[in-house]
Amino acid sequence: MQQTYRYRNIIIKPHCMQFVINELHLLVLTSVGFVYAGIDDAVLSTLVFVLSLLLSLCLAYRMVYLCRMRYIISNEQLVFEHGVFHREVDYQELYRVVDFNESQTFMQQLFRLKTVSIYSGDRTTPRLDIIGVPMKENLVTTIRERVEISKRRRSIYEITNR
């Protein structure tokens, strides 16, 4: 008799500092623009103010987009939900996952975050990046266990040439 494994779904959302990491250059540029536009008798201060305001709207949209991102790891699938005005949901079957990678940019190292990349045999989503994961989370081990159980449940065995 085959043993049945039931795990609760894991929901992962990017850490809010990932927004600062991704958009630091635009945050600085917008701040400098507003400061410059506030200077009396500055050349083109109205234009700089309008551009800074538009950049602020763009940053607000990107912040909402990042906050609405959600990764769900279930027993059978890895689900990625994203979008603001146009919502999309990408599904990846766990038994198709073939490899993992953890990486950190310099800024992610400063804020103790990482990006976990998941590679699969899926045609539409061969690589899925889970961004803004806290360093203390051992996500790869958790996903690897679920992948192995999913493959065992479906009697899928990997054959390698060595």
Language model segments and positions:
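N-terminal basic, Ser/Thr-rich segments that initiate or prime the first beta/alpha elements at protein or domain
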Residues: M1-R162
